[in-house]
Amino acid sequence: MRLLKFTLFFHIVFLGHTQEHPPVMTFPPEIYNAANQNWGITQSDDLKMYFANNTGVLEFNGSKWKLHPTDDSSIVRSVKADGSKVYSGSYMDFGYWERNQYGDLIYQSLVEEYGISVLEEEQFWTIKVLDDWILFQSLSRIYMLNRDTKKTRVIESKDEIWNIFNVEGIIYF
């Protein structure tokens, strides 16, 4: 009986202390110097975090924050890192950010580069990478851009598109 009490005591006292809560850090807008609303998040291959923020794309390297505002000061709704590029979607525009020779992120509009005609008031909420294709989803269309061939496709929907999903190489919406 004493052995049973000791065993129970040991398990309750010591095993209860082995579970730790993972560290959670909260960053208020005053720390990262941008708006308080973030719409999306992605992580690049070099482990930097990127956030779609009301004032641009936020970059966090684990210790420092840097804001990359859009040229037209529009809200960034979506962000997706892929290789050396960080794709973003905003108000009537989508494109990518890439580092120049000085290490600064520079924005390139794919709407301008490909000569894409977007709808009035269109915003881009989700970005997916599928093989050589980059997909930008608004509430009524999905724009597909092939990075190798530079071909574009537009999928229109009579219903609102709330999100897109990649399941084993097949896109669902």
Segments predicted by a language model, with ranges:
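Carboxylate-rich, polar loop motifs that coordinate divalent cations or form catalytic acidic clusters
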Residues: 1-173
